[in-house]
Amino acid sequence: MNKIIVFETTRLFLRQYKDEDFSALHSIFSEEETMRYYPAPFSMSKTYDWIERNQSRYKSDGFGLWAVCLKETGQLIGDYGLVKQTIDGRIEVEVGYHTNKRFWSKGFATEAALACKASKYCRP
């Protein structure tokens, strides 16, 4: 899969997940504090499934969670985007994001949210 940039901000670019993102994503998803609102941190298997599920969503839904990368270095620092959830028997679209703990409190999630809001990719 090629590096497909979905949209950019001053400091970030958001792109589709690649299989090579596993290590960076697993370091985020296996961190207990980051995953405190999930039943448990992700195993390696769950992280692989997460990548595959979002790659499928790009094709089926036209959106999903995208890799959030620093423009300056290309480093993946988290993900951000839209996902479908079933709530009370209805399919709803929600905003989701995860950020590597080292990058908390730097405004990256807000920056990604504002760019997403202005993007055609955040209009399901």
PLM segments and residue spans:
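Glycine-rich acyl-CoA binding loop
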Residues: 105-110
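GNAT-family acyltransferases
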Residues: 1-102, 115-119, 123
